[in-house]
Amino acid sequence: MTGTLGQDTTNQICGSYDAVLEKSPNVEVVFEGAGNWGATDAAPLAENWLASGKEIDAIVCNNDGMALGVVPVLKSAGKSEQIKVYGLDATNEGLKAVDSGEMAATIYVDSKAEIEKAFEMLEDLKAGKKVDAEYKVPSVLVTKENVKEYMK
């Protein structure tokens, strides 16, 4: 489930997912649709997917807000145990849902490390040093096993 179609953030996240899927031939994407970053649009989209009768093993969302919109849909359909829900951002609500088992996982993006690296690169540029055009700060998959480390 994507964010708003055409937005840079949606494109970046989906591009990363697509790169992983290319290396995963056993994974079949059954549905893709825009949940527009929130539960309000995510819930009816998930309802439509479930109503199709197609087999769904997981719903992977571009953020925790959409994932949290999917959770009650699965509960009311009695599918919480069969269909795993994944989010991104490791919000407080998302982390609580992982801890309770409502979500299988979320991805922690270290914004502080990103900002620190951006300022480091800025200082290097100001000093006349060459910097890479892109730098990736590692993300962490947060599951039931490590969620307590990320909860506030």
What is the meaning of each model-derived region?
Residues 1-152:
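A residue-level marker of the well-folded mature domains of exported/periplasmic proteins
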